[in-house]
Structure formats: structure tokens, C-alpha cells
A protein has these predicted regions:
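N-terminal/domain-start segments enriched in small and hydrophobic, helix-friendly residues
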Residues: 60-80
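A short, histidine- and acid-enriched strand-loop-helix "catalytic/donor-clamping" loop
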Residues: 98-113
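Nucleotide-sugar donor-binding catalytic core of glycosyltransferases
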Residues: 2-51, 70, 78-86, 115-276
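Catalytic alpha-helical scaffold of carbohydrate-active enzymes acting on polysaccharides/glycoconjugates
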Residues: 23, 60, 89-90
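Glycosyltransferases and closely related glycan-assembly transferases
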Residues: 64-71, 85-100, 142
Length: 276
């Protein structure tokens, strides 16, 4: 199968986000024998300054040319908000039997996820999202579906076996990101609930050796530095932005569990259902 994957492949981040879901989907597609073509919407948008002033008209024109040249059987979209529905409709006009699916790893109540799904509902054949909130059904049209999929693990990326270590510098690890865009602590924060939890641990469990990032003026950590720090503790905190909803977790859960760290997760996520 020929697959066109449209997502943010974060070229401007210089490799610090190499564990993102978009890369794991690429890897899985190739391992399963498919011919893959990628299109990075945000990077393509930055390549021509005129996209700032014409609602990404040039970007969408380039995408249409890519579609025509590659002639895919399946189009996969992930967090590609700069792509117009009009462009996706043109895909289906050109190729009647084409299927378009969209994946999303955001909390239903955050980052305009509900609005984004509803906006795409008449052009997407199937949605896949890493939570199971009951209101997701309201985002559908008569001709598509929505399914839960867990955060993706990739053995070529999450390849540490922390559980085999015997000596650790710290007892517990946590990395607060404040979003992947800048990779820096924000002056206007929206994560006080998680910071409060970390402060509670420091006050109530002073003998615990913590290794926390993105907190208490310690900058977030990324790339191979993240992996090295993760490996220095046997346990990790998997704290996601609230509100807690069914089966949702930050995609950091893949890096924690996949690398062999024992994690603590909020019971209100109901993730324990998946292990019973």
C-alpha cells in the first residue's frame, strides 16, 4: 500500500523530539511493507513566508502536487492543522476510493481537540485518539468512525531496560514539558496542579531522592538527555494535564513504560481497565 503521512515532523526542533508518534507511525508502516511518503505541514509552511499571509495557500497547493505525484492508497493525518478541508476533498475527487484517517494524542477537553474533530468530520473516514471520552461520538458524521488507540511504543525508540538496572542515582523521575514548542518553562503556567503534587512529595517524603524537571526553575529536558535522566531512577511519575478523562495519558507514558520504568498514574484515567 502507498501511504501519504501528513503531520508535524518537527524539523525545526533539531532532533529533540525523535520519539514523537508521527515517527513511530512511519516506522510501523515501513516495517509492515508499505511505501511511505511524508509531508511535514508546519515545516513546509515555514519554507515560504507568503503562507503567513495567504492562509497557507502555497502549502496546500504543494500538498496537492505531492498527492498527485505519489498517488497514495491511504492518507494519514496527525495534528496537521494547516491543511484545509478543501484540499482533502480534492484528494477524494481525484481518487474516488481513497481513504483518509486522522490520529490524535490530545486530551478531548484541551488544545481545541473537540473543535478540530468536528471541523474534519465530513472529510475523514476514521479517527483514532488516545482517550475514550463519551462525548467523542458527537464529533462524527454519518460516514465515519472513531476508535481508541493506546499511546504507541516502538522498540527501536524505547529500547532501554531500566528494570534490569541495580544501581540508581535517584528514586523517582518526572519531566514536565509545558508543551513541545519552545521546550522552556513558561512564565504563564497552566500546570499548577502537577507542581502542587511535586511539592507535596518534597514536603511529605523528604528522604525520597527526586529528579524532577520543568519544575522549581529547572528547565524541561529533551532528547537523549531525557533518556539518560530517565534511566537514573527506577520509578517515574506519569502526570497528565487535567481534566482526567477515560484512558487518556500524556504520550510520555510510552517513554516511561517502553523504557522499562515503573510508573505511577492517576487512577481517574481508568487505565487500569486495560490491564485487568
Amino acid at each position: 500500500m502507498k501511504i501519504l503521512h501528513i503531520s508535524n515532523f518537527v524539523q525545526k526542533q533539531n532532533g529533540r523530539l525523535y520519539w514523537n508518534h508521527c515517527f513511530k507511525i512511519n516506522n510501523g508502516s515501513i516495517r509492515n511493507g508499505h511505501n511511505l511518503c511524508i509531508f511535514s505541514d508546519r515545516d513546509q509552511s515555514r519554507m515560504n513566508i507568503l503562507n503567513k499571509f495567504n492562509d497557507n495557500k502555497i502549502l496546500n497547493k504543494n500538498l496537492l502536487s505531492t498527492f498527485i505525484n505519489f498517488d497514495p492508497d491511504l492518507v494519514i493525518i496527525g495534528h496537521a492543522d494547516k491543511i484545509h478541508n478543501k484540499t482533502l476533498r480534492e484528494f477524494k475527487t481525484i481518487k474516488k476510493n481513497l481513504k483518509i484517517i486522522e490520529w490524535n494524542v490530545d486530551n478531548y477537553y484541551l488544545d481545541n481537540t473537540e473543535e478540530k474533530f468536528k471541523k474534519r468530520s465530513d472529510v475523514i473516514d476514521a479517527f483514532f485518539i488516545t482517550n475514550a471520552h463519551k462525548n467523542l461520538i458527537t464529533c462524527l458524521s454519518e460516514n465515519n468512525s472513531i476508535s481508541f488507540f493506546p499511546n504507541i511504543f516502538d522498540q527501536s525508540i524505547e529500547n532501554m531496560k531500566i528494570f534490569e538496572n541495580n544501581n540508581f542515582k535517584y528514586d523517582i523521575f518526572f519531566a514536565l514539558s509545558y508543551g513541545v514548542g519552545t521546550g522552556k518553562i513558561r512564565s504563564k503556567k497552566s500546570d499548577y496542579d502537577r507542581e502542587t503534587y511535586l511539592e507535596y512529595i518534597h514536603k511529605k517524603l523528604p528522604n525520597i531522592k527526586t529528579n524532577f524537571f520543568g519544575y522549581n526553575n529547572i528547565e524541561p529536558i529533551w532528547g537523549s538527555f531525557f533518556e539518560k535522566s530517565l534511566s537514573q531512577s527506577p520509578i517515574s511519575l506519569n502526570l497528565s494535564r487535567k481534566p482526567n478523562i477515560k484512558y487518556y495519558s500524556s504520550d510520555r507514558i510510552s517513554q516511561y513504560l517502553g523504557n522499562g520504568s515503573c510508573i505511577f498514574v492517576d487512577i481517574n484515567s481508568q487505565l487500569n481497565d486495560l490491564f485487568e
